[in-house]
């Protein structure tokens, strides 16, 4: 589901990467912060920014953390080139539209917020008194924090994620067994979707910490990748297995991702998004199409899995199919038919053994 993660999050992650510890940009901002002079930095010298600029002087010099620190001693804003490689202008007065709403109080932060909204550029405000770096982009406001604080929060989030993944594994193990026995209820499916989304929301938060930590986030990144190897893929395939026929599973995924915490914990709300009306979740038996389970068989391309599901419609019928029935499907020869039969048999055996442990 990562490619469908909300655009706002992706936009913020890209911004944080440019200002992560170890980058020249972060070094320059930290220098201004330590000097307690305050500052306003606009990332990008496009036409919209230049229209709002008044006064100041041209620099057109290569970006340097020490240059930006010296230029911040003046009252005006600093404008950098779009690729962040040049300091274009300094000591600029920014004159955004005063009718643009902002909830900021200080003059520097009000200006930064309005310029970001009006131009769509990233604007960074460094507070003189509060010792805080604030990033603005469109409606996004994000406060950069010290690496030690971020690292502590990231470690705490990893611990939470470990617990969530352990619960998800149990829920998935139960769903696997029910799928092989064709005894799945809507309640079991919704529980798996909810647990997957809970894990992915923590992953999104940790991704943000990793971007903000830069080089210091490598260990956290490795731990994250180890914990959530196939969670996203499985989550999407559950939705593809169970959403109503005429529905676009990608849009169902996006709808679930955009739900508030209260909404996605409401089982009936998830059920409705999946295309089921007001039906009792525990009493409604549903059969999977088989995308998720067949995708676990090694060396079977996804195009073949799609042909398989298209032909048999349900996992139950794929399990019951003979070698000859499988052989008739486009892209499946005798060798693949054997691989599918033995692969599903092994998966069923593993599922039963895990349940007994």
From Swiss-Prot:
GO terms for molecular function: adenylate cyclase activity; ATP binding; catalytic activity, acting on DNA; diadenylate cyclase activity; DNA binding; hydrolase activity. It catalyses: 2 ATP = 3',3'-c-di-AMP + 2 diphosphate. Belongs to the DisA family. The keyword Disulfide bond does not apply. Homooctamer. HAMAP family: DisA. Residues 9-147 form the DAC domain. Its cofactor is Mg(2+). Gene3D superfamilies: 5' to 3' exonuclease, C-terminal subdomain, DNA integrity scanning linker region, DNA integrity scanning protein, DisA, N-terminal domain. PANTHER family: DIADENYLATE CYCLASE, DNA INTEGRITY SCANNING PROTEIN DISA. It is an enzyme of class 2 (transferase). Keywords: ATP-binding, DNA damage, DNA repair, DNA-binding, Magnesium, Nucleotide-binding, Nucleotidyltransferase, Transferase. GO terms for biological process: DNA repair. Participates in a DNA-damage check-point that is active prior to asymmetric division when DNA is damaged. DisA forms globular foci that rapidly scan along the chromosomes during sporulation, searching for lesions. When a lesion is present, DisA pauses at the lesion site. This triggers a cellular response that culminates in a temporary block in sporulation initiation. Also has diadenylate cyclase activity, catalyzing the condensation of 2 ATP molecules into cyclic di-AMP (c-di-AMP). c-di-AMP acts as a signaling molecule that couples DNA integrity with progression of sporulation. The rise in c-di-AMP level generated by DisA while scanning the chromosome, operates as a positive signal that advances sporulation; upon encountering a lesion, the DisA focus arrests at the damaged site and halts c-di-AMP synthesis. The gene is disA. It comes from the Bacteria. The keyword Manganese does not apply. It holds the Pfam family DisA-linker. ATP binds at residues 76, 94, 107-111. This is DNA integrity scanning protein DisA. Its EC number is 2.7.7.85.
């Amino acid at each position: 589901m990562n490619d469908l993660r909300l655009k706002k999050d992706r936009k913020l992650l890209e911004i944080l990467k440019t200002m992560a510890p170890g980058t020249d940009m972060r070094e320059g901002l930290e220098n201004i912060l330590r000097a307690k002079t305050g500052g306003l930095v606009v990332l990008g010298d496009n036409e919209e920014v230049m229209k709002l600029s008044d006064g100041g002087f041209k620099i057109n010099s290569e970006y340097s953390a020490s240059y930006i620190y010296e230029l911040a001693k003046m009252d005006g804003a600093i404008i950098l080139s779009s690729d962040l490689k040049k300091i274009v202008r300094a000591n600029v007065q920014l004159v955004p539209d005063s009718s643009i709403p902002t909830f900021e109080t200080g003059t520097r932060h009000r200006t930064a917020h309005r310029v970001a909204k009006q131009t769509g550029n990233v604007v960074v405000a460094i507070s003189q008194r509060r010792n805080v770096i604030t990033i603005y982009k469109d409606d996004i406001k994000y406060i950069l924090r010290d690496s030690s604080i971020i690292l502590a929060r990231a470690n705490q989030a990893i611990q939470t994620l470990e617990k969530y993944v352990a619960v998800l594994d149990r829920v998935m193990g139960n769903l696997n067994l029910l799928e092989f026995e064709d005894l799945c209820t809507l309640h079991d499916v919704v529980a798996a979707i909810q647990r997957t989304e809970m894990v992915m929301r923590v992953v999104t938060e940790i991704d943000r910490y990793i971007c903000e930590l830069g080089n210091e986030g490598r260990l956290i990144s490795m731990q994250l990748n180890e914990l959530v190897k196939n969670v996203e893929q499985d989550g999407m395939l559950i939705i593809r297995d169970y959403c109503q026929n005429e529905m676009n599973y990608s849009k169902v995924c996006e709808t679930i991702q955009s739900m508030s915490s209260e909404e996605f914990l409401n089982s009936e709300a998830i059920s409705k998004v999946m295309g089921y009306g007001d039906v009792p979740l525990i009493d409604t038996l549903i059969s999977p199409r088989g995308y998720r389970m067949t995708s676990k068989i090694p060396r079977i391309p996804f195009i073949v899995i799609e042909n398989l599901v298209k032909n048999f419609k349900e996992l139950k019928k794929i399990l019951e199919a003979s070698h000859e029935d499988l052989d008739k499907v486009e892209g499946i020869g005798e060798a693949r038919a054997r691989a599918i039969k033995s692969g599903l048999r092994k998966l069923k055996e593993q599922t039963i053994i895990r349940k007994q442990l």
